[in-house]
Each structure stands twice: as C-alpha cells, then as structure tokens.
From Swiss-Prot:
Residues 1-21 are annotated as: Disordered. PANTHER family: CYCLINS. Changing residue 239 to A: Abolishes binding to Z600. It comes from Drosophila melanogaster. Ubiquitinated. Ubiquitination state is negatively regulated by a deubiquitinase complex made up of bam and otu. GO terms for molecular function: cyclin-dependent protein serine/threonine kinase regulator activity. Belongs to the cyclin family. Cyclin AB subfamily. This is G2/mitotic-specific cyclin-A. One of its GO terms (cellular component) is male germ cell nucleus. Component of the Frs-CycA-Cdk1 complex composed of CycA, Cdk1 and Z600. Interacts (via C-terminus) with Z600. Interacts with otu and (via C-terminus) with bam; the interaction stabilizes CycA by negatively regulating its ubiquitination. The gene is CycA. Essential for the control of the cell cycle at the G2/M (mitosis) transition. Interacts with the Cdk1 and Cdk2 protein kinases to form MPF. G2/M cyclins accumulate steadily during G2 and are abruptly destroyed at mitosis. Residues 206-332 form the Cyclin N-terminal domain.
Length: 491
C-alpha cells in the first residue's frame, strides 16, 4: 500500500521558539502558541481559535484597551460583555416560529396618483363582480398549464374555482340552461385541466387543425390481420376487452386505453406475433401508454400481477423496448377520444351525450378491420352524430359542421357501421365496455336501446337537414342587412 510523509522541519525554522526534546524523532511540529512564554513544551496542546479575537462589534468598556486574552485562562466567558444587553437575545421559542407571508391590505397598499384604494383590483376576488343581491362570474381566468386529463386535480394545477361564492338561489335558477336571474348566460369554469386548456379561445381552431394534420401520420394498416398466421380478430377483441378491465381496475384515463390499442395495432401491422405472446404485447403497450399519459402510472409489477404471473418483469420490460423500437418512439398521436373531448368543450355538450358518444366510439375499438381505415376525426364525428340521433336530438348542426369540417353526407358509411356495432353489442362475449358504461358515473348510457337505420333513413335525414339549412340561409341575410344598416346610421 502506498504511503506518504509530511515534510519534517528538521532545522526548526518554522518555530524557533520551541525546543524539541532530545531523543524524540519524527515529532510533528505544533502551531505557535500566541501569548505564551518564550519556551514551551513541544507536545503542549495547540491553541484554540478563542485567542484570536476578531469580533470588532463586541462592546468594550470605556477607557480600557482591549488586549488578547491569555490562553491559559480558559475559564473566562467569551460572552461576558453581552450580559448587559439581554433584551437583544432572541428567546428560544421565537426561533421556531414559522414565517408569515406578506399580504396587501388597505394600510400597506399604495394607490397610484389620481386613483383611490377602492378602485384597485381585489387580488382574491378579481373574477367576481358583486352586485346588489347577486354574485355572478365575470371573465373567468383560465389556467394555462394543464397537467391532468381526468377529473382528479393535477398536482401542478391551481384551484381557481369560485363556485363557492355563488349563492344557492342563483344556482337553483336556470340550472339546466346556465342562465342567471338577470338573463345573462353564466360562464361556468371548466371541469378539468384538459377542458380548461381547450377553453383558450384564440387557439381552438389552431389546435383542431394541428390534430387533423397529426392524425394522418403513423397510421396502422387496416388489413394487417390477414398476414398474421397465429392470431385472429377474435383474439384481438378478447385482448382489448381485458385491457378495458385493467384500465378500470387501476382507474386509468380513457385516453390511455385508446393509446394502448393504437400502439398494439401499429406493432401488429409490422410484426408477426404468436398467440402465446399476444397478451404480453398488449400488456407492454398499456404500460407504455400509462407512462406516457398518466401522472402516476402503475408499476410494471402490477401489470405482471394482472397477467397471473404468466410473464416476468424482465419479459414485459424487454417487450417494451421492442415496441418502442418498432414504433420509432413516435407515441404522440390524436385519438378519437381527443377529438370527442374537443367537440364537447366547443359545443358545450351535455354529459349524457358525451358519454353516449364515448361508448359508441369505444365499441369501435373491438372491430379493427372495419374501422382502422377511417381517421379518428371522422370516427369521432360519426359517433357524435349517432349519439345525438339515439338521444332524440338533431343529428347534425351547422356548428358541428364548422368545427369538424365534415358534412352529414360524409358520415354516412361510418354512421351505418357504428349503428350496427351498437346494436350487436349486447350479443358479444366481451362485455367489459357495457359493464363500464352501465354505471351511474356514465349515466348508464349502455342500457339505452339502439336504433334501426338504413341507407334510405340516413338519406332522408340528410335531405331534411339540408332543407333546413337552406331556409336558414335565406333568412340570415335579411337579419344581417337590417343590423348593418342600423349600425351604419348610428355611426
């Protein structure tokens, strides 16, 4: 083992006042003792730092000269001069008190020149306008950093809800219509962070346009199952039904389920899989989607447990690497769920209509070969149209046509397919989706009866919708002309 030695001062140049006893070799040289005699024992203890009095703030008695304290007098209290000023000593209890946050009030606020304090904006209630006998929302400030996609509040989201300041009398009036007693439509805050993000008005159409461009990339092949030798559509349906149960067991977001199916189809479009490894591929796909979409995704051990230990952690992690390599790490894509959420926000969609739309859209995940040829935007638009028709509403509106960029005639083929899928859902062996949407959370939309629709029925609906649109177009110019003339003469 290598060793080193400190240079020895053999000539005693550093400390000439200290003598080294005769016969003592390799003795370490101590530091010079300040304030001692000329000769001291070489083995005497080194001086402590108390002899170096560098504190210039110590109160000194008047008329005396402060000198260095003798090292030998070790019983002298260094803080003896502070005894007269006990009022400056902070009590022990005060040291552990928490600090307080400065808050503006009328005593500390400074009003700008020409303005009174009463005209300043209240920082706590800047979005509430108090009137005589009423409280209504004004200019709700939207959160610009959405972090969650579910109704559970995100750890980084700020709760700015002001529903608590609304009087119960205001809520009871116009509950369904959202109209205040004064006749003004209330601007209720969004329900979660995703919808709060989409409420940014100036970006709404740009976001939709970006979704439409992104959905065309990284599409799975519609007929990939024909090249699979060991698996079939029935096996795929059973796997997706199991993924629905897993997502409900761990309360994963619906977007996680859509992404899992999307990754599965893209992987199977390029790789041939044996039936014994199909569940492993689905498990790894959901594991990737959960890590991509969820805030707190389940651990890999949870997925291994759900497979009844059919696979090991190493196998799941290895399959995760294979899937990511085959997909080239291109994981971001808009699904039908994203479009449905966007339409729900822009059109102020009722909850029952939204859940019915989601139920119809999720049923389409079970049939890969039928619906993989359609874009998610088209699938979501057709699901909205069929859900409105089932609930007895008008199938299509000008607002939906403007947002989705699809006319009612463009949805004919997909709507007819979805109508057949919704009708035969009760006869399927895979019932996880029906059990999911039979709950009170989803308004039990799966219990509603399906409707019969043929091509002729759909053509009649399209004709009626187009006739109504023409009538509205004939009436609209007269109203606009009258309004423009009035505005022109006012100026």
């Amino acid at each position: 083992m290598a060793s080193f030695q400190i240079h020895q001062d053999m000539s005693n140049k550093e400390n000439p006042g200290i003598k080294i006893p005769a016969g003592v070799k390799n003795t370490k040289q101590p530091l010079a003792v300040i304030g001692g005699k000329a000769e001291k024992n070489a083995l005497a203890p080194r001086a402590n730092f108390a002899v170096l009095n560098g504190n210039n703030n110590v109160p000194r008695p008047a008329g005396k000269v402060q000198v260095f304290r003798d090292v030998r007098n070790l019983n002298v209290d260094e803080n003896v001069e502070y005894g007269a000023k006990k009022s400056n000593v902070v009590p022990v209890v005060e040291q552990f008190k928490t600090f307080s946050v400065y808050e503006d009030n009328n005593d500390t606020q400074v009003a700008p020149s020409g303005k009174s304090l009463a005209s300043l904006v209240d920082k706590e209630n800047h979005d509430v306008k108090f009137g005589a006998g009423q409280k209504e929302l004004v200019d709700y400030d939207l959160d610009s950093t959405p972090m969650s996609v579910t109704d559970v509040q995100s750890p980084m989201s700020v709760d700015r809800s002001i529903l608590g300041v609304i009087q119960s009398s205001d809520i009871s009036v116009g509950t369904e219509t959202g109209v205040s007693p004064t006749g003004r439509v209330k601007e209720l805050p969004p329900r979660n962070d995703r919808q709060r993000f989409l409420e940014v008005v100036q970006y709404q159409m740009d976001i939709l346009e970006y979704f439409r461009e992104s959905e065309k990339k990284h599409r799975p092949k519609p007929l990939y199952m024909r090249r699979q030798k060991d698996i079939s559509h029935n096996m795929r349906s059973i796997l997706i039904d199991w993924l629905v149960e897993v997502s409900e067991e761990y309360k994963l977001d619906t977007e996680t389920l859509y992404l899992s199916v999307f990754y599965l189809d893209r992987f199977l479009s390029q790789m041939a899989v044996v039936r014994s490894k199909l569940q492993l591929v689905g498990t790894a796909a959901m594991y990737i989607a959960a890590k991509y979409e969820e805030i707190y995704p389940p651990e890999v051990g949870e997925f291994v447990f759900l497979t009844d230990d059919s696979y090991t952690k190493a196998q799941v992690l290895r399959m995760e690497q294979v899937i990511l390599k085959i997909l080239s790490f291109d994981l971001c894509t808009p699904t039908a769920y994203v479009f449905i959420n966007t339409y729900a926000v822009l059109c102020d969609m009722p909850e029952k209509l939204k859940y019915m739309t989601l139920y119809i859209s999720e049923l389409s995940l079970m049939e890969g070969e039928t619906y993989l040829q359609y874009l998610p935007s088209l699938m979501s638009s057709a699901s909205v149209a069929l859900a409105r028709h089932i609930l007895g509403m008008e199938m299509w509106t000008p607002r939906l046509e403007e947002i989705t960029t699809y006319k009612l005639e463009d949805l004919k083929t997909v709507v007819l397919h979805l109508c057949h899928t919704h009708k035969t859902a009760k006869e399927l062996n895979t019932q996880a989706m029906r059990e999911k949407y039979n709950r009170d959370t989803y308004k039990k939309v799966a219990m509603m009866e399906s409707v019969e629709m043929s091509k002729d029925d759909f053509d009649q609906l399209c004709e009626a919708y187009n006739c109504k649109q023409k009538e509205d177009e004939h009436q609209q110019p007269d109203i606009n002309t009258k309004s423009n003339v009035n505005l022109f003469y006012k100026f």
